[in-house]
Amino acid sequence: MSFLKNNVEGFGSTVVNTGEVSGQGLSGAYAQTIRDGYPLFTFVMPTFLRFDAFGNGVYANGAKDELQGSALPKFNAGLTNNFSYKKFTASFFFNAVTGFVVYNNTANALLLKGSLKNAKNVTRDVVNSIENSINPGNVSTRFLEKGDYIRFANASINYAVDVKQGSFIKGLNISLSGQNLGLFTKYSGLDPEVNVDKSRNGVPSRGFDYTATPRARVFTLGINARF
């Protein structure tokens, strides 16, 4: 279990912006900043409020940029256990990460509900959206989401097979293991544990999801024989 609290210090009045945002009409747009007195990799963007009666976006404070949350988690914990029963042994590991946000650039660039309403086989939330089809997908908290998650990271089970005394095989174990077995999160993208490189002018970024490939779920069957 670990906690993280950090602030950039000694930066003076210097402000470094990073986190290039991809998408139509978003050339040169950014969503992250590094500045004195704030956590590293803090997001900066207007606060989205709602759509108006015409389906256009409404933003707080005249759509001025505001400092939002950080991409660095504040809390990280793990739970592991090993146990055995007769000839079975097993283990599992869960990890939980909270206190950070992710910018869903995939939704910003490709999943604007207003522009998808005239397509075929769309989801219910697209059909029911009041967003105007020409409403621009500006960088805003509309696409900034909590990334908190609990992951069933791995598990394994092993069985020691009985072998006859004096047989050719002295010992035999059969095992089955799995990686990335489950993910519990309210993040709307595929996986909140992403970090697509959206650096700007050589300054690194963190916490951006842009068409990222989710972690694979892997199962492994093993047989260990001793002769």
Predicted features along the sequence, with ranges:
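Flexible, solvent-exposed coil segments and beta strand-coil junctions
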Residues: 54-63, 129-141, 198-205
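C-terminal beta-signal and terminal closure region of outer-membrane beta-barrel proteins
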Residues: 17-44, 119, 135-139, 185-227
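Outer-membrane beta-barrel pore domains and translocons
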Residues: 1-2, 84, 95-97, 177-181, ...
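Hydrophobic, lipid-facing positions within transmembrane beta-strands of outer-membrane proteins
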Residues: 75-81, 152-157, 217-221
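Extracytoplasmic gating/loop element in the C-terminal half of outer-membrane beta-barrel translocons
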Residues: 40-42, 97-181, 186, 195
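Membrane-embedded beta-strand positions of outer-membrane beta-barrel proteins
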Residues: 92, 174-176, 223
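Conserved small-residue
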Residues: 1-71, 179-189
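Repeated loop/turn-to-beta-strand initiation elements of outer-membrane beta-barrel proteins
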Residues: 87-90, 164-165
